[in-house]
């Protein structure tokens, strides 16, 4: 590798062989290199900037280039070339101003003579002759100088600034191209890899580009563009890439800015390309409209195929046999055609492309003909069919277009010789120039054709067939029919990316000033689209479409602000300023002018006082000069958007176009007939000689030429029209009678067809006229479909509520509700019920039972809520929906059920609405009960299941129907935890929330289903109300507007029934007709389109509001079904019915009503309040949060204060206070701890044994809260008494509890703190062996009274201890007297006014049962003697007696039945004990308390008597003993 990068000290060696990798034969001075050069000593890349050098003397240096850029060492002044082992290397001649790297040479005397390339295969030869260099240069174009010609590129032969220039100029001498091999490609790849060794992604992207080109994914222009953008900033790589480009393509780099994309210019055969800063490749648009990418994609393909038949590694267009780099070089260098032949071929290709476009435009209405033409060309190119067969097929295809056939002959080789005899007679002679365009061929070769190429397949050039793969044969046709689908990918065709600015080649344009001007114009315009428009102007000028004055005038738009370019352009076109163009006046700033509406501005007076010679006094009076149109758009970027037409307007426009076309042709034909009739009358007066010499001008003696020519073309066709026109001009005496007769015949035919079409047009016009006026109908349906869904309605409610909260936090005043609806017309509510009834009968998909339930609910609920008489719903909402029952039976049953009318709507609703709501609630509860009972017991009949629930509801509702006292509250006043008085600032009492007052607002609390039902209901109500308000307008339209009598006489005015296909309903009002149409739609008598047309006949463009009435009713019924089948809502409606019938209410009642509703729904259901104001007939809807107040209409501070305190003293949570904001008012450490294991049975036994049975609560505390101090003040003499019921957790057998209590008692009694406390050992020893019989026997007591008197004190102390223990056990006292436990944040004890919640003991009221029976205790002691032998021996008789008394008392107390453990406890009494309920009345509780007190008193008295008797028998103990 080091050998390959040898360095050479130029000028020190005298022999050519001494330069192993460089040979110099140039004797002139050297050129200073510039830019970044790479130095590779020892294979280590180093990048440095070349120092400046000067050329002090000598002629201007001539630069020399190698095909691979040299590597320059600035320190030693050496230039290093890589040894690529090439035979011959030719270089291009760059512009010296570009400053590229040149070869450093020594003095001329030290340079060797030019070597021979054949003798040194490893030497790179650089020619010193400029002429020779020009002849030998390859396709690399590294110069931007316009003075140097660019062989290999196709440029115009005529200057765009000089019209009618002779294109026939002597071509330059032919060029020779060095055959590239695989070594050149690999060397370039190594250079790219070395340049980007630190950026491998760029090298990989370059390889991807080459792979895409090889796979035919992209084409040559795309490759050049992407490589230029990839190597931007590396001019040596871009210049080196020119070596591999096909002829006609080159990349040039501007010397001003070689490192940016703006300095890169790409030249293609189709025109120049520019790469802007954004990386987009732009090019001038095609001059003759848009052309298909098919011929453009093949233009360079055909050129390259004709220029070179051998394979060489240039960027050829992708083909199946073309590779990116061919590893096998050609054995010999190919021969290229001269430049004039290539230019001629390019011209022929342009003509072929234009011909294909003409064929496509001609057969635009017959695409199959155009596709057939392309198939013929493809078959010729692929299958190499004979040219005679091609011509025969094309002649049949173009039978109706002889002009295309004549033009097609120009592309055929020797048609007159090779065509069949029958075709030669019909064809004309091939033009001479087409024959000369075809080069001579050998007899064995296939004739080369100038047919337009299709896709990427060029016409066959050799006789040997080249079959393509099958998958490739169909590809060009698909691309042609689909207009090149590949343009949608990153690849685009040459015609689209590089549109031609000129149709003629520009290779012979040698005017450097023009090219320089175009370059400056491109840089000045910057915008590629503007530059393309400028090129179009130049092309039109070169074609003499307009003169130089018009060109200069139009170019002011592009270069008006650049005086230099305008003067340059005038010099190029030799503009004569004899008729100077007026300087454009500055435009008026209309934004500063006075406005009139959004679209007009008033011009200043200086703009109004302008002379005008063509106006008279009337024009100055009438015409507007002051106001100009200046619409104000929504945005400066957005232009004016025309009104979007609907499909019916489009139909009318098409109809008018067809009608206009008929009228235009008939009118023009009539004018031509009149003109020819005048000439025919004139001709009758002429002699034969005058007729023979008579001619007509081009306008045939009329005022216009185009009108008559169009009529001739319409009647005779375009192929014969010109001949007829010439005959009319040259021989009118013979032609006019024939043509006149033909025109009159056509006039009769066209008028007959017009009459036939008028009938069809009239029908189409009637069907589309009213629909075309309805611009809101289509959009209304789509919007209404989204806005009536439950999801949309619920989200709208929540968004409004959230927005109101935000506004309220900002201090803004917001209403308490989210929606406020008005129901002023009760008749519309009746009409809605009418539509509901029709839909339930004809359109409902629910069962008959559900329909009956919904109908009953609607009758009762609508009358109850909206204060509408119940009788008005009976004719429309049937009570039965059985299939066997007819409508007459249903109506009669409804009338039988009809009650007597009442004058008061509320009273009427109370009588009838309640019964219907009761029926609905019965069915709802019944259905839920049936579902539950069917799972539990299958054998229970259906009747037995329904009867109890229905009777319960009847019983529940009948209780409130009997209550007619308005002052009595339906709901409970609510339990309060404290008695409170509300006082004002002056000490007067305020309302505590229990005062009843008259009301006009009735609340209905519901969930989201009920909310959606009300929203949809009001939507239907509002639309019917809007339609009803249009009654006067619709009535005037039907009766006041009279039809035109002429139109009626001609049959142009038809009755709406004839157009609709059915008769409109007859009614007194138009609104009634609309309701009947809605009924007929739901009944299925008319379809949706007929329904809409009928509404348009009644209301015109305002009828769109009822287009979706059927879908809206369907949505309402769907929500109604979910409401009536919801069991929770059934209970809520029961609460609403109880509140609705009351004319007076209080805030506390409404709070309790809301609490009951929330309880019925549960905590997860969203709550909304729908209230009805009977005075204003308005309904408000508001979303109820947990923190929202029930009464949202409080105004004064006193009302708000009383409302808050009234909610505060209730046992329910205070309204307006969130639960998370409530602070617990006691310490958690004071709560009883539960350290034991709940699963441990012994722990449960302990808890149950220590449980307190009785509970007591007496609430008598009263307080006062003044409004001014907000401090609680308690009333004197009031208090609260509370005893709680402990938690009983054990439900096992009672024996375990008894045993546990006895063991604990005996353990304590025998301890030092028990009965032995304070006694001496002798006393204990004496008392311990005693028994109960010995102690309490009468004889023993009498005889031993004196002896034991001394021990009286000790026994008395023991007796007192036992009495105290018994009292403690009997009274149920316990050491732990903490607060009762909380259940779900609420106390387990409910407070009341002096209410004792003791549980009944269930014992017999007989006093004898409460006394201690010692004999029974002895028996019981003997029965358990075996179980407690050890403990029995250690206990004294007194201890045994005390323990037995305690056990008996505990048993008596614990046998009180409990709702959890009573079933497991044995009955200790001889009489039957019935368990008491959980909650008893005050009277029963008082009786039980009295019994319990008596029992306890008797037990205590008996114990005291026993102990007193014992004390009298014993002696009084001494103080020491005590």
Swiss-Prot record:
<feature type="compositionally biased region" description="Basic and acidic residues">
    <location>
        <begin position="1461"/>
        <end position="1474"/>
    </location>
</feature>
<keyword id="KW-0804">Transcription</keyword>
<keyword id="KW-0805">Transcription regulation</keyword>
<feature type="compositionally biased region" description="Basic and acidic residues">
    <location>
        <begin position="928"/>
        <end position="960"/>
    </location>
</feature>
<dbReference type="GO" id="GO:0003714">
    <property type="term" value="F:transcription corepressor activity"/>
</dbReference>
<feature type="modified residue" description="Phosphoserine">
    <location>
        <position position="1443"/>
    </location>
</feature>
<feature type="compositionally biased region" description="Basic and acidic residues">
    <location>
        <begin position="1403"/>
        <end position="1432"/>
    </location>
</feature>
<feature type="compositionally biased region" description="Acidic residues">
    <location>
        <begin position="1488"/>
        <end position="1522"/>
    </location>
</feature>
<dbReference type="GO" id="GO:0045815">
    <property type="term" value="P:transcription initiation-coupled chromatin remodeling"/>
</dbReference>
<feature type="domain" description="PAH 2">
    <location>
        <begin position="345"/>
        <end position="415"/>
    </location>
</feature>
<dbReference type="Pfam" id="PF08295">
    <property type="entry name" value="Sin3_corepress"/>
</dbReference>
<dbReference type="InterPro" id="IPR013194">
    <property type="entry name" value="HDAC_interact_dom"/>
</dbReference>
<feature type="region of interest" description="Disordered">
    <location>
        <begin position="928"/>
        <end position="968"/>
    </location>
</feature>
<protein>
    <recommendedName>
        <fullName>Paired amphipathic helix protein pst1</fullName>
    </recommendedName>
</protein>
<feature type="domain" description="PAH 1">
    <location>
        <begin position="178"/>
        <end position="248"/>
    </location>
</feature>
<feature type="modified residue" description="Phosphoserine">
    <location>
        <position position="442"/>
    </location>
</feature>
<dbReference type="GO" id="GO:0000122">
    <property type="term" value="P:negative regulation of transcription by RNA polymerase II"/>
</dbReference>
<dbReference type="GO" id="GO:0005721">
    <property type="term" value="C:pericentric heterochromatin"/>
</dbReference>
<feature type="compositionally biased region" description="Pro residues">
    <location>
        <begin position="328"/>
        <end position="337"/>
    </location>
</feature>
<dbReference type="GO" id="GO:0005634">
    <property type="term" value="C:nucleus"/>
</dbReference>
<comment type="function">
    <text>Has a role in modulating the nuclear import of TF1 virus-like particles. Essential for viability.</text>
</comment>
<feature type="compositionally biased region" description="Low complexity">
    <location>
        <begin position="442"/>
        <end position="468"/>
    </location>
</feature>
<keyword id="KW-0677">Repeat</keyword>
<dbReference type="InterPro" id="IPR003822">
    <property type="entry name" value="PAH"/>
</dbReference>
<dbReference type="InterPro" id="IPR039774">
    <property type="entry name" value="Sin3-like"/>
</dbReference>
<keyword id="KW-0597">Phosphoprotein</keyword>
<keyword id="KW-0539">Nucleus</keyword>
<dbReference type="InterPro" id="IPR031693">
    <property type="entry name" value="Sin3_C"/>
</dbReference>
<dbReference type="Pfam" id="PF02671">
    <property type="entry name" value="PAH"/>
</dbReference>
<feature type="compositionally biased region" description="Polar residues">
    <location>
        <begin position="1478"/>
        <end position="1487"/>
    </location>
</feature>
<keyword id="KW-0678">Repressor</keyword>
<dbReference type="GO" id="GO:0070822">
    <property type="term" value="C:Sin3-type complex"/>
</dbReference>
<dbReference type="GO" id="GO:0033698">
    <property type="term" value="C:Rpd3L complex"/>
</dbReference>
<keyword id="KW-0131">Cell cycle</keyword>
<dbReference type="GO" id="GO:0031508">
    <property type="term" value="P:pericentric heterochromatin formation"/>
</dbReference>
<feature type="region of interest" description="Disordered">
    <location>
        <begin position="307"/>
        <end position="339"/>
    </location>
</feature>
<dbReference type="InterPro" id="IPR036600">
    <property type="entry name" value="PAH_sf"/>
</dbReference>
<feature type="compositionally biased region" description="Polar residues">
    <location>
        <begin position="1385"/>
        <end position="1398"/>
    </location>
</feature>
<dbReference type="Pfam" id="PF16879">
    <property type="entry name" value="Sin3a_C"/>
</dbReference>
<dbReference type="GO" id="GO:0070210">
    <property type="term" value="C:Rpd3L-Expanded complex"/>
</dbReference>
<feature type="region of interest" description="Disordered">
    <location>
        <begin position="139"/>
        <end position="174"/>
    </location>
</feature>
<dbReference type="GO" id="GO:0000785">
    <property type="term" value="C:chromatin"/>
</dbReference>
